[in-house]
Amino acid sequence: MLPTILSISYEHTYAYLSKYQTAYACEGKKLTIECEPGDVINLIRANYGRFSITICNDHGNVEWSVNCMFPKSLSVLNSRCAHKQSCGVLAATSMFGDPCPGTHKYLEAHYQCISAAQTSTTTNRPSPPPWVLSNGPPIFGNGSGLIHPPGIGAGAPPPPRLPTLPGVVGISGNPGLFNVPPQHTAVTHSTPSSSTTAMAGGRLKGVATSTTTTKHPAGRHDGLPPPPQLHHHHNHHGEDTASPTKPSSKLPAGGNATSPSNTRILTGVGGSGTDDGTLLTTKSSPNRTPGTAASGSVVPGNGSVVRTINNINLNSAGMSGGDDESKLFCGPTHARNLYWNMTRVGDVNVQPCPGGAAGIAKWRCVLMKRMPDSGYDEYDDDPSSTTPATSSADCLHNSSSCEPPVSMAHKVNQRLRNFEPTWHPTTPDLTQCRSLWLNNLEMRVNQRDSSLISIANDMSEVTSSKTLYGGDMLVTTKIIQTVSEKMLHDKETFPDQRQREAMIMELLHCVVKTGSNLLDESQLSSWLDLNPEDQMRVATSLLTGLEYNAFLLADTIIRERSVVQKVKNILLSVRVLETKTIQSSVVFPDSDQWPLSSDRIELPRAALIDNSEGGLVRIVFAAFDRLESILKPSYDHFDLKSSRSYVRNTAILSNDSDVNAGEIQQRLRILNSKVISASLGKGRHIQLSQPITLTLKHLKTENVTNPTCVFWNYIDHAWSANGCSLESTNRTHSVCSCNHLTNFAILMDVVDEHQHSLFTMFDGNMRIFIYISIGICVVFIVIALLTLKLFNGVFVKSARTSIYTSIYLCLLAIELLFLLGIEQTETSIFCGFITIFLHCAILSGTAWFCYEAFHSYSTLTSDELLLEVDQTPKVNCYYLLSYGLSLSVVAISLVIDPSTYTQNDYCVLMEANALFYATFVMPVLVFFVAAIGYTFLSWIIMCRKSRTGLKTKEHTRLASVRFDIRCSFVFLLLLSAVWCSAYFYLRGAKMDDDTADVYGYCFICFNTLLGLYIFVFHCIQNEKIRREYRKYVRQHAWLPKCLRCSKTSISSGIVTGNGPTAGTLCSVSTSKKPKLPIGVSEEAHDDPQQQQQTPVPITEDAIMGASSDCELNEAQQRRTLKSGLMTGTLQAPPQTLGGHVVLERGSTLRSTGHASPTSSAGSTHLIFAHKQQQQQQQQGPLGESYYHQPDYYSWKQPPTGTGGLKTPREYYNNTGAAASSPQQAHEVFYWTQKPNSGQHGKKKRGAGGVPASPSGSLHSRTAAASQVLFYPSYKKTKAGQPTGYPQYAEALDPPLATGNAAAYYQQQQQLRRQQLHLQQQQQQQQQLSSDEEQVEQHAHLLQLQRRAGSQQQLPAPPPHMAQYQQEFMQRQYRNKQSNCDLGMGDAYYNQGSVGGADGGPVYEEILSNRNSDVQHYEVGDFDVDEVYNNSVGTGVFNNMRAAVAAGGSRYGGGSLSGGSVSSRSQQQQLKKQQQQQSLAQQRSARRCTADDDDDEDEEEDEEATAAEQLHDSVCDEDEEEDESDLEDDAHGLPPQSDERMRRLMAMQDEDFKRRFQRQLRKHGAPLDYGALPPGAGPQPEHNGAVFGVSGGVGEGSKRGAFRQQQQALNAKSPGGRLAVNDLFGHGNSGPPLPPANQTPAQKRQQLQKLSPQSTTSSSSHTSHSNPNPHPHQLTHPHPHQHPPHHQQRHLSAMLDENNTVRCYLEPLAK
């Protein structure tokens, strides 16, 4: 196939090889045209009129029209000169007419002299320039006139690299349309030995040709010759075909080994008069096999050859019709007053310049990627396209790949759908087009006798009114520079200084005006006629020309002067200053000189003086408008020297990947400020001693970022940042500092308007991962905070807990602010607030980490190692330092520069300036270094302590602190990794760093690990929290029933042993039996052998699990406790019957009890009044442990035996009538007292005997088994809420199975009483007179009624225990190891409701008010019995009894006023006797002041006296604590608590007494011991204060009275001990405590029932009571006594998670 030449004939080709000439003739003159002999004239174009102001204008008239044209000028000339050797035509209106009257016209003719033999085919169509074709050897070997098509030939050797070819590559290397080898024939036989072959005029490369046969294609319907074919059909049967080459066998194996794998299309335009842009389609796959179609190989199919160029099928047989073929051609269009015809992709259309300008215009057609529409899949198959069938003959060439070639061609066709032919650049290249008048000015300026002022003036006038082309811009700037150079020599010819200055100033004015005209908007198209490189060159020439002319004037001025030239687009200022007058920096421009911009440049005084010359400083300032639209950043485009393209989205076609996978996403940078210039006379562009300061206003404030201070480099014609730095920036302005002078501006990145958040730099996967990571971390932080809040009962309010709460809050704020900030734009005000708060949160978080490390260090170096309590002053100091310092630093930063939070690219970062490093980086580093330093010091201290001999509890606490420090250190390192990775990722993404993604994924991983670490090591690892999680989840209604435990379940546990044997769990339970406490089972009742089993040690988790209401597995077998006394350990005997808790020496406490679903976390509330006869059991051979079953209905039971009481032997052997009664579930409570040695001494601070928490972790409680906490607390119940408990009935079910009729009757009676009690309670609530009464009623416990005759005698101990009685009591007294027992005197508890009901439990569940848990009492520390051990005797007790009988009883140092009050003399006598006999007063080294109020009345003064005496005894005890520590260590007992705890307990005791006495006096209660609080009446000795009452009778007797009563009790029942019931119900007569829980209506009824007779009767009865009552009388009120209803005091207790019994005494009514 032989193509023809586009749009021209061969004759035209020869004509263009001739010289191109132009002739002019002014109006009235003759135009003569002549050619050489043998040649004739060939006219190209002609015009009679005026296109230029400079031609035929000797006088410089600028008023003539330059758009004057006679349309038939060419026809007139052709009639006179066409095809002639010479001719002459008169340029006159008589010949051509007058197209523009008043304008002096001229005749212009463009012609060529061609051979006379070619005149027959010459046409008037404009022809391409002469270098389209070039001379060379014969094109056809056989002499035919056909031109060989491009791309056919043996192929030249591959060049070392892909060259940048000119716009039209000529033959034999010369410019031309085709690149044909010199030795070329019509038919060639070659193998693809070269991967680079010129095609389509050298535009498409990378084609290795195979054997081809050329044919001339059919003519086109539009009359134009068809374009040369890029791909050729293979004719297997043509006559000229010679041995076709098979690619599968002939291709060399390494033919394409050097080809890269990708293909990049680079498009551009030429410059400097030639088209040196290229369309590069090189680089094919290096992994081609010989059996596959290589680049440019022949793919057989349907009898046609499908030639591919790097998998791009530009033209194939599969394409049919004009639509497919038109994709390879750019359509015709009009641009710059020229018509551009259809042009093939890769070719350059060339034609003459428009409007009378000399030169040629060029425009390239390229194949560019089409922007895909939304929802359009660019690789979807065309539904209309069909895949051609493959013939069997085609498969013979490659049977293994018969179908793939067709599929590959189809795929290539689909890829071509995404590309379209496009004219590039957007406007034609008119760099070579020059107006004729500018050529005339250029010639004039080079003449010696020309007037420079006239030339400059003509240039300024023409540029302001005429349209310029690209070449005109080059000529104009060249003239400006030439004028300045000539004026530099010509000024010496003017002897007068003023004349010289005037001439140069006029020249400068014309030059500035010309420059402003070039920058005007009307000349924008002229700038676009230039390629980007030429634009930069012209701009540089304009700037230097203006500067040269300005300094020409500055050098002429010899005195101080300032000249300002202000035009539309340029402000120029020339200043000549004397150095002596320079007092400060010089600023340009003035505010009133340049209103177009607020830009400002400031030159320091020192820099000016250093560059002075002759005492004068010459400065040139310039400010430009619209220059920023020309001086574009060059590195935004591709390499201009090789491609000259500014197309950012370049298509990359890969052989192995999709097209869009290789799209280049480059950063788009713009010049975002006006250009401002400054130069000094000496050296002009020199380094300055001091930098200058520039303030530049941003032209665009939205969607721009990353400002950079740059200057224009004259050498490279590009912007450079060397020597300039950004000082500060905000949304509208930037401040720069540079150490040299030139033209300055601001470069900024453009952010996509549709995606302007931080996530625009994330790919899809990373964005999802960041969301997930932050979400996980936030969830776990919230869980940690909720754990601290919901399960606050588990934790001690310590400094460590407060620190970690603050850390969690700071981390939560940081995560949320980061997530919110990365979605915001960097230009919004809200973004600034996010950055501010994030700054503060990070500083606070790092500060809290530092304080946490410091707290661990201080714990190890102080006495806080063994006692972790709330340290409010220290925590407050932490709060002040953390948040105070953080807010102060942020405030200082805001005051210094508020814009630092709004000028950065992202909302989560500050701008990296000096303020950022001073207010953010430095404080964070200081806190982190301090935290690491304190952690290192803590490790050193722990290593030293581990080598020293410490007590067991100290080692335990040290291990806990060591674990906390390890966790904190890992936490700190993990948090540092999170923040560092986030910072480096953001910075890297900002600079398009390749490592940004690595940091991004590191941030995702570390942030996720941070959340998991918080949850695991700060929540899950703490066994207390795990237990609370189980309880919290299982006790809520939103869970299925299968996951929740029964609300009626009973949890219990027993801890026995000391030391290694501590923590032994001993219990037995069977499947679905009565829910008895641990230690009770039916096997234990029936099988004595089972009771002899050895205890089974169990871990802390199992112990706590057994005590949880959800952990009791009723189907499991539990063992009972082995009998006997272990060495050094007191243990329960085998007679452990009826659920109870055994407390042993040195052990912790576990208690049975129902855990209500409404119980607060970490507590087990004990509920009393289960139906069971009262029992008192002595456990073990020493009878150390007791248990009690408070029985609400025991007074209803018929008496059995002697008075319904068992003998001591019956109790001990579990015989008698009670033995046959069913054993029912019940709940009791005990509390421990701190063991103490016999001798006391002063002990050191901080050595309080608080064993370590089982977990020993972060949230360890300081309360332990040896600590008893007293709370005045109550629970508000809802109206109509039942108070019965279903476990009562459940506990009675098993006896029914045995057929016990008595048990069944007992159960029925109990159920009826409960129902009656519930009904009466509801009626009482309905009778409430107001809402206030109802609230008060709900806020108190149930009403209790004292019933006479319900108390039973204390059972005597077994006979074999008598010999151990004295030793046991003495040891128990010395060690203060006692049990609070409810076995005696339950008349105080077994009382009915207010209405006299018989049913209902005695107690409701009591919820502790956690806010009131502020008083911690150590019962063991309240050891006042040692003070009165030898001083208080029987006489004191008798005197106290006599005083009580006389009506002058004192309680706690205060007056108990009933019917009468003791006199002042009796009080003084008792006080004096007490002080004389007190052993504590003799050993007292100091006195403790009481916290009593001096403003109390006379009765309160007496209370203060007793309180002071009590404090004396406590203070005396401090001196002996040091000695007690030694004995504590010897016995393995925990040491005593510190002095503060004892003082607090004493003050609470005194406060209780005062309130109680006021209540008695308020109601006028008689002196009845039954009405006294616990310990007020005569009682036997009890070892330890209980329920906030220290015991004692009156002032002179405190603990001695207990000893007296204990001796009296021992006389009746050896080994008997007074229980709590006796403490609260003293004596056998007198009214009970006033009912504090009565409603106002009930109180009024009670007051109405009171009468003087009853009061007198009570007083009389009390006065005749026996001063030394029998123990039986102490616990039994008179059968006929009917006490009035006074305030009653109720007692309850709960066991917390730290084995601490919390006893609750009902608060007194106000």
UniProtKB/Swiss-Prot annotation:
**What are the record's GO terms for cellular component?**
plasma membrane
Q: Domain of life of the organism in this record? A: Eukaryota
Annotated site residue numbers, Cleavage: L741, T742
- Where does it live in the cell? Cell membrane
Q: Please classify the protein's predominant subcellular localization into one broad category.
A: membrane
User: Which residues carry the post-translational modification Phosphoserine, per the record?
Assistant: S1156, S1253, S1260, S1329, S1330
- Which InterPro entries does the record match to this protein? GAIN_B (IPR057244), GAIN_dom_N (IPR032471), GAIN_dom_sf (IPR046338), GPCR_2-like_7TM (IPR017981), GPCR_2_extracell_dom_sf (IPR036445), GPCR_2_secretin-like (IPR000832), GPS (IPR000203), Lectin_gal-bd_dom (IPR000922)
Q: Return the Gene3D superfamilies for the record.
A: 1.25.40.610, 2.60.120.740, 2.60.220.50, GPCR, family 2, extracellular hormone receptor domain, Rhodopsin 7-helix transmembrane proteins
Indicate which residues are glycosylated according to the record: N142, N256, N302, N341, N398, N655, N703, N730
Question: Keyword Nucleus, does the record have it?
Answer: no
Q: Where is this region: GPS?
A: 709-754
Return the Acidic residues bias intervals.
1491-1505, 1515-1528
The record ties this protein, via PROSITE patterns, to: G_PROTEIN_RECEP_F2_4, GAIN_B, SUEL_LECTIN
**What does the subunit section of this Swiss-Prot or TrEMBL entry state?**
Forms a heterodimer, consisting of a large extracellular region non-covalently linked to a seven-transmembrane moiety.
Q: Which PANTHER family match?
A: ADHESION G-PROTEIN COUPLED RECEPTOR, LATROPHILIN CIRL
| Protein name, UniProt field | Latrophilin Cirl
Its source organism is: Drosophila erecta (Fruit fly)
Lineage in the entry? Eukaryota, Metazoa, Ecdysozoa, Arthropoda, Hexapoda
Gene assigned in the entry: Cirl
